[in-house]
Amino acid sequence: MADVPGAQRPVPGGGPEPRDPLDCWACAVLVTAQNLLVAAFNLLLLALVLGTILLPAVTMLGFGFLCHSQFLRSQAPPCTAHLRDPGFTALLVTGFLLLVPLLVLALASYRRLCLRLRLADCLVPYSRALYRRRRNPQPRPARSSPGPQVAPTSGKVWV
């Protein structure tokens, strides 16, 4: 038999067979595009969750830094009408104290959302672009007796 470059040859052992070079390249581009879309959705979800949960702390820090006389000396009406420097210092301290617990809460909720949406399952490994899976039919086990089948017990008894 002649050895043709790029021809599909069966791999001994029934494992995955390599794809043609052009097919491999096209699949690699598609796998990369899908993985980039999943990563972009992950970043968008992370920004949405962090932005929503960290909003109170960021607002306090923003007003504290914008209105305190040691930083920007802003003469905007919200800065001069409501608080003085001790109030803006309290805003800064409270904002920094709230930042870490809210960050932990935001990351925990992001993780829970990722697990619930199963976003990690959407990532495709590059081995799928390089190898084609063989579809071998799984043989069904033959029934030994025509009677009802008893499920194996695990040793636990529920009373």
Swiss-Prot record:
Q: Which GO terms describe its cellular component?
A: plasma membrane
- What is the first-listed, main subcellular location in coarse terms? membrane
Q: How does it sit in the membrane?
A: Multi-pass membrane protein
| Keywords of this entry | Cell membrane, Developmental protein, Membrane, Transmembrane, Transmembrane helix, Wnt signaling pathway
Supply one GO BP term: Wnt signaling pathway
The cross-references to InterPro entries, in alphabetical order and at most eight, read: TMEM88
Q: Where in the cell does this protein reside?
A: Cell membrane
Task performed by this protein: Inhibits the Wnt/beta-catenin signaling pathway. Crucial for heart development and acts downstream of GATA factors in the pre-cardiac mesoderm to specify lineage commitment of cardiomyocyte development.
Subunit comment for this entry?
Interacts (via C-terminus) with DVL1.
Family affiliation = Belongs to the TMEM88 family.
This chain's protein is named Transmembrane protein 88
